[in-house]
């Protein structure tokens, strides 16, 4: 066994032991740990920024692009937001131990379901060190142990944050191994983590399509994931066009880089001439490049012809594909063929069309008269999220505290025996 395998095996064993202790942890102890972490992050700001400066300097020397450097940097504001996030998670209801679906059988046996932690969660993520705190806090609050493996470019930052997390756990009388940060940049550690089925119950990858595709191929541990966010807005024949203009504009321009950004606009032929000229001009003035089908380009004079690659692409930038369709069925067929199952929306005042769209579009979130950029756990009232899942099993859509738990059956009787 290699040194990396030995190291990861030890991490996994400690996490599994800690997960059993976390099953017994009280809500008060978990909240105490979270609040201690929030105080320590602010108190140790200088130490955190010194560690982060090493990562930023190395990343800049290696030519990391400006947007990624910005994500990597722990500014005063980002540190304050991490502390505030910890306090917000501490204030959320504890999902553990809640009882649902209670019934009494004819023989008097009481049957119910209890919400319990998943166990040990591995989180694999790229350059943003704030994910270390977000992931640790959500896993802790939901009663799970977690193993965190951040990007190599943020190693010093993540290790420093990990020390703060473990000090908070210790202060609350919880096992420090409930949150462990992998302190090696060796990629073999990731390969081992996603195959340790005896110690890890689920993996949550946070990163680009390349990372998630690779993990999906290599993992033996189940993944909660989404590959990409190729999101659509369909403007129906019965749409309020003022709403449609604002929804489509917001869905594209709110933030280009989020996974809920609209990448393709589908417009019913009956309203295309009235919607597209003004909307196209507004988008162009905002710096958005338009790529359309031949029919759409009639009303988008500066647009470029779209091809199949455009329908399939998650741009994560100021580019929008536009297609004119003749029916709601054609719109839903397009989404079924080219969509990623993330988030899709219809703009319509027709109730039956709205109901059909929500019933038949097979995505993790389906909206009526809302922009797709609402795909976010905070917007759903979840308080926080570990990510967005397009899986059909277990969690789907934004994954908050409840998504990091599962249900077990609990039965109570008075000595009944089965006949």
UniProtKB/Swiss-Prot annotation:
A biological process from GO: L-proline biosynthetic process
Subcellular location: Cytoplasm
Cited InterPro entries: Ald_DH/histidinol_DH, Ald_DH_C, Ald_DH_N, Aldehyde_DH_dom, G-glutamylP_reductase_CS, Glu-5-SA_DH, GPR_dom
EC number: 1.2.1.41
Enzyme's top EC category: oxidoreductase
Source taxon at top rank: Bacteria
Pathway info: Amino-acid biosynthesis; L-proline biosynthesis; L-glutamate 5-semialdehyde from L-glutamate: step 2/2
Cytoplasm in keyword set: yes
Molecular function in Gene Ontology: glutamate-5-semialdehyde dehydrogenase activity; NADP binding
Segments crossing the lipid bilayer: none
Record's catalysed reaction(s): L-glutamate 5-semialdehyde + phosphate + NADP(+) = L-glutamyl 5-phosphate + NADPH + H(+)
Annotated keywords: Amino-acid biosynthesis, Cytoplasm, NADP, Oxidoreductase, Proline biosynthesis
PANTHER family documented for this protein: DELTA-1-PYRROLINE-5-CARBOXYLATE SYNTHASE, GLUTAMATE SEMIALDEHYDE DEHYDROGENASE
Role this protein plays: Catalyzes the NADPH-dependent reduction of L-glutamate 5-phosphate into L-glutamate 5-semialdehyde and phosphate. The product spontaneously undergoes cyclization to form 1-pyrroline-5-carboxylate.
Protein name: Gamma-glutamyl phosphate reductase
Organism for this UniProt entry: Bordetella pertussis (strain Tohama I / ATCC BAA-589 / NCTC 13251)
Lineage of source species: Bacteria, Pseudomonadati, Pseudomonadota, Betaproteobacteria, Burkholderiales
């Amino acid at each position: 066994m290699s040194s990396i395998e030995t190291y990861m095996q030890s991490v996994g064993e400690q996490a599994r032991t800690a997960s059993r202790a976390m099953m017994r942890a009280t809500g008060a102890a978990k909240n105490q740990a979270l609040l201690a972490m929030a105080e320590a992050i602010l108190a140790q700001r200088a130490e955190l920024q010194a560690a982060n400066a090493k990562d930023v300097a190395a990343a800049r020397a290696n030519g990391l692009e400006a947007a990624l450097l910005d994500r990597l940097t722990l500014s005063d504001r980002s540190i304050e937001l991490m502390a505030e996030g910890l306090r917000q998670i501490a204030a959320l209801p504890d999902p553990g131990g809640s009882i649902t679906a209670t019934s009494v059988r004819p023989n008097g046996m009481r049957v119910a379901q209890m919400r319990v932690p998943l166990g040990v969660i591995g989180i694999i993520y790229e350059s943003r060190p704030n994910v270390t705190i977000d992931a640790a806090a959500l896993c802790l609050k939901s009663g799970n142990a977690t193993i965190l493996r951040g990007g190599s470019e943020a190693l010093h930052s993540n290790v420093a944050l990990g020390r703060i997390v473990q000090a908070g756990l210790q202060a609350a009388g919880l096992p420090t191994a409930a949150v462990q940060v992998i302190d090696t940049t060796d990629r073999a550690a990731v390969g081992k983590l996603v195959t340790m089925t005896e110690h890890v119950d689920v993996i949550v990858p946070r990163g680009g399509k390349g990372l998630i595709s690779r993990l999906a191929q290599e993992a033996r541990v189940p993944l909660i994931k989404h590959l990409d966010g190729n999101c659509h807005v369909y403007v129906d024949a019965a749409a309020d066009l003022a709403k449609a203009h604002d929804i489509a504009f917001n869905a594209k321009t709110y933030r280009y880089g989020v996974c809920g950004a609209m990448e393709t606009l589908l417009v019913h032929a009956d309203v295309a001439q009235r919607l597209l000229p003004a909307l196209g001009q507004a988008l162009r003035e905002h710096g958005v490049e338009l790529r359309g089908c031949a029919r759409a380009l009639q009303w988008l004079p500066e647009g470029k012809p779209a091809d199949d690659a455009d329908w399939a692409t998650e741009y994560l930038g100021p580019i929008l594909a536009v297609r004119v369709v003749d029916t709601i069925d054609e719109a839903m067929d397009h989404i079924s063929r080219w969509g990623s199952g993330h988030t899709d929306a219809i703009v319509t005042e027709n109730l039956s069309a709205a109901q059909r769209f929500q019933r038949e579009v097979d995505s993790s979130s389906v909206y009526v008269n809302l922009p797709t950029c609402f795909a976010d756990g905070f917007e759903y009232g979840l308080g926080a999220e570990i990510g967005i899942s397009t899986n059909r099993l277990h969690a789907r859509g934004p994954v908050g505290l409840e998504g990091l738990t599962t249900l077990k059956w609990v039965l109570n009787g008075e000595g009944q025996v089965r006949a």
